C-alpha cells in the first residue's frame, strides 16, 4: 500500500514537471483588489423578444431595444430550425451577407457573431440571450433543408434594427 502511494506521488511529480513549464497547469495568483461596480451601472431590464420560425421565414419585430435581449425562438414549421444572430457592419448589406454566404458556403469574415440557438425540432422552442448595441443585425437559420438548399436561400433570414 505504501509503495503504491509512493509510486503515485512520483508519477504526479513527474507529470507536474512537464505540465507546469508548458503552461498547462497554472497556479492562481492572489487577487490584490476587486473592481466593484455601483448598482446604478448594472443593467436593470432584459427585453424579451419572441421570434416565430416557420418553413422558411422569421417573424419578429423589425426594431428591437438596445441592451440585453432574451430571444425565444418558437419553431412553428415542419423542419428543423435554428437562429444565429450577427451584427451587420455599416459598410455591408444583407445582400452582401447572402451573396458571400451562399457562394463561399461559410459566414463572411467581416460578420460579427453574437450567438446561436440550438437546432430545434418542429413545435419546440429555444432561448438565446445577447447584449445588443444600436445598429443593424441579421437573424439567420444556417442549416440546410432536406433538398440541400440552405434555409437562408429559401428566405429564412431577416434584418432587424436595434435602437
Model feature map: region roles:
Residues 105-109:
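Charged, glycine/proline-rich intrinsically disordered loops and linkers
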Amino acid at each position: 500500500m505504501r509503495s503504491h502511494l509512493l509510486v503515485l506521488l512520483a508519477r504526479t511529480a513527474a507529470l507536474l514537471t512537464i505540465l507546469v513549464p508548458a503552461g498547462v497547469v497554472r497556479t492562481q495568483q492572489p487577487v490584490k483588489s476587486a473592481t466593484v461596480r455601483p448598482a446604478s451601472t448594472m443593467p436593470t431590464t432584459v427585453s424579451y423578444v419572441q421570434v416565430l420560425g416557420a418553413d422558411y421565414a422569421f417573424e419578429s419585430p423589425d426594431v428591437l431595444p438596445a441592451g440585453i435581449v432574451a430571444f425565444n425562438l418558437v419553431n412553428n414549421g415542419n423542419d428543423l430550425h435554428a437562429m444565429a444572430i450577427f451584427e451587420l457592419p455599416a459598410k455591408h448589406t444583407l445582400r452582401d451577407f447572402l451573396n458571400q454566404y451562399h457562394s463561399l458556403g461559410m459566414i463572411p469574415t467581416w460578420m460579427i457573431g453574437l450567438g446561436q440557438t440550438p437546432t430545434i425540432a418542429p413545435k419546440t422552442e429555444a432561448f438565446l440571450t445577447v447584449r445588443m448595441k444600436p445598429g443593424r443585425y441579421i437573424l439567420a437559420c444556417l442549416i440546410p433543408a432536406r433538398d440541400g438548399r440552405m434555409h437562408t436561400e429559401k428566405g429564412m433570414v431577416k434584418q432587424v434594427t436595434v435602437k
